[in-house]
């Protein structure tokens, strides 16, 4: 089973993102476990037990950059879809992030990121 983690600092954004991800996955007949985290410490503690297949990272500014760097260093094979309020596209490229976009969080952008990840991994 796939596990998709959402790490955000805004509760409503996390709920909306989970709904967008759920809709996309249902269309693809994939039914992952979706977990939402608003606390980086809790998120990274949980990854020691279960490494998510994909992480949707939506944290502002440098905290998002730090989380992306930390996540990539710990789990280089984990898929990352990263949304930021700042243009960290060059950092995302350097970190081999599967998909980067700038806020606002929109369903179409999340779907594009998931499509790229699914295509790279040939998930069926």
Locate predicted features.
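Conserved acidic carboxylate
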Residues: 8
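Non-catalytic signal-transmission and effector/linker regions of two-component phosphorelay proteins
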Residues: 1-5, 15-18, 124
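Acidic, metal-coordinating helix/loop segments flanking the phosphotransfer/catalytic sites
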Residues: 36-53
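A general structural signal marking secondary-structure boundaries and capping sites
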Residues: 25, 47, 121-124
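CheY-like receiver
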Residues: 53-123
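Two-component/phosphorelay signaling modules centered on CheY-like receiver
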Residues: 11-35
